[in-house]
C-alpha cells in the first residue's frame, strides 16, 4: 500500500526533487494508426507523469504543439507516447525511492497522507480520519506552494491581452 500512496502524492504535484529529463528512444513497433511513432516511457527512473514533451525545437505545453492534422502533438497510451514527431524529449515526474532525495515539504505531505490512510485502522475513530486528512490537505498545500516558488520565476511575455490593461 505504501508504494501506491507514495506514487499518488508524487503525481499530485511536479515536485522539483522528482523531476527528470530524458531523450526517448523510438520503439521498433509503430502505432497501427493515428500517429507515426511510438516511444516507451522511461523505466529507470520510472515515469509517473509527463510534464513536458519536446521535439527538440518546440515544446508542449509552452508552444501549444499540435500534430499535422491539428490534433494533440502526443498522446500517452499505456506506457508509451505516440506522436508524429521523429524526436521525443520529455520532462517528467520520476518515481524516486530514496527518501534522502525528497524535499522536506514532500516528506511532510507523504507522512500526513500515510497517517490519514492508517488513522481508522489504528484508532477506530472517524474523527481522527477527518483530522489527519485535513492535516494532509494543509501540508500538501504548503509544500506545493514552497516547491512551486523555488528557482527561477517564469517571465510572462507581453501580449495584446496583457498590454490592453495598461
Listing of model-derived features with the role each one plays in the protein:
Residues 1-166:
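Glycine-enriched, solvent-exposed interface loops adjoining structured elements
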Amino acid at each position: 500500500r505504501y508504494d501506491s500512496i507514495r506514487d499518488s502524492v508524487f503525481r499530485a504535484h511536479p515536485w522539483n526533487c522528482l523531476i527528470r529529463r530524458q531523450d526517448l528512444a523510438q520503439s521498433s513497433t509503430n502505432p497501427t494508426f493515428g500517429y507515426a511513432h511510438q516511444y516507451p516511457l522511461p523505466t529507470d527512473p520510472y515515469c509517473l507523469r509527463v510534464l513536458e514533451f519536446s521535439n527538440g525545437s518546440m515544446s508542449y505545453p509552452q508552444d501549444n504543439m499540435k500534430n499535422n492534422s491539428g490534433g494533440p502533438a502526443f498522446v500517452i497510451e499505456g506506457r508509451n507516447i505516440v506522436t508524429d514527431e521523429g524526436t521525443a524529449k520529455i520532462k517528467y515526474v520520476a518515481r524516486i525511492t530514496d527518501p534522502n532525495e525528497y524535499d522536506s515539504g514532500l516528506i511532510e505531505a507523504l507522512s500526513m497522507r500515510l497517517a490519514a490512510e492508517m488513522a481508522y485502522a489504528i484508532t477506530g475513530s472517524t474523527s481522527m480520519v477527518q483530522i489527519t486528512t485535513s492535516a494532509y490537505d494543509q501540508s500538501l498545500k504548503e509544500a506545493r506552494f514552497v516547491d512551486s516558488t523555488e528557482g527561477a520565476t517564469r517571465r510572462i511575455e507581453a501580449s495584446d491581452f496583457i498590454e490592453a490593461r495598461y
